[in-house]
Amino acid sequence: MSAEQNIETVKAIYEAFGRGDVDAILERCTDDVDWAADAAIEVAPWHGVKHGKAELPSFFAGIEQTGPVTEFTPLSFTGNADGDVMVFLRYAFTVTATGKDVKTNLHHYFRFRDGKVAYYRGSEDTALIASALSA
C-alpha cells in the first residue's frame, strides 16, 4: 500500500478513536499487531506493549478510565517510501482522579502490513503524565 493510502487508514483510526469505536480501530490492525506508548516509566493505564487484537482494547480502556479527552488534533501526517506513517498531534485530557488538565504533543509511528497497522509506537511526555496522575 502507498503512504497516501496508509495515511487515510490512520485518519480513519483517529476518527474511530474520536467516536470511541474500538472495533473500527481493530478492523484496521493485523491480528498480531504490536501496539505501545513508548514510555520511560509505565505510570498510565495505557502504558505497556499490547500484543494482538485481544490485548489492544485495554490500551483504549486505559485512556478512557483516566478521564475525558479534551483535544486530539493531528497537525501533520508524513509517509515514507516503505508506507510507514508518522503523525504529530496536539493532545489534551483531564485526569478524573486528580482534576489535573494535561496538554501535550504526541508523536505516532505506524508500520503497515497488507494495508493494516502491524506496529504502532506513540511517544509522550511521561513525566508530565506521571505528575498529572499523582495527587
Where on the chain are the PLM-derived regions?
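Short, low-complexity N-terminal intrinsically disordered segments enriched in polar/charged residues
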Residues: 1-31, 134-135
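A beta-strand edge to alpha-helix "cap/lid" segment located at domain peripheries
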Residues: 1-5, 61-135
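Charged, low-complexity, helix/coiled-coil-prone segments
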Residues: 1-10, 46-55, 102-104
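Hydrophobic pocket/interface hotspot
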Residues: 10-13, 25-26, 33, 52, ...
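Short, mixed-charge, low-aromatic patches
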Residues: 11-20, 43-47, 63-67, 88-90
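Short amphipathic alpha-helical segments, especially helix-boundary/capping motifs
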Residues: 18-19, 32-38, 83-86, 103-106
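Short, flexible micro-motifs
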Residues: 19, 23, 51, 55, ...
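A solvent-exposed, acidic/Ser-Thr-rich amphipathic alpha-helical stretch
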Residues: 24, 30-83
